[in-house]
């Protein structure tokens, strides 16, 4: 039986257009139903400071309390960071970064493989390397435009971008 969510209705309809709201709720639904483990998508909230990106991300964190972790997109996009996947070692349902930066990703291979749920080699400090297939759905907020260096990269078609209205 459908319930009522007046606080969510008021919050999300103020901060986001109906189209952007649909994207957010679609992603949440995909995570709840387990479809996100098969989908090759990730969610990026892009907008000015103070427009509600972290507000919605905080709600998502509360929904998946105990099933999320934090990550660094900068580390994932750096070919020199051998331990970038260490944050995913527990294979969380959701990985979140409130204030990320995808404007200067030098190598998007790792992000693409992670979002595509491909087998990856994981290096953890003080442990032997091992392989894992992560089923994690990535969510991040950013104030900077996303810039993918390789126009043919799979990251572009996997990105779901959400922009706030700027209303308060």
Model-identified regions with their sequence ranges:
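P-loop NTPase catalytic core of nucleic-acid-dependent motor ATPases
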Residues: 1-93, 160-163
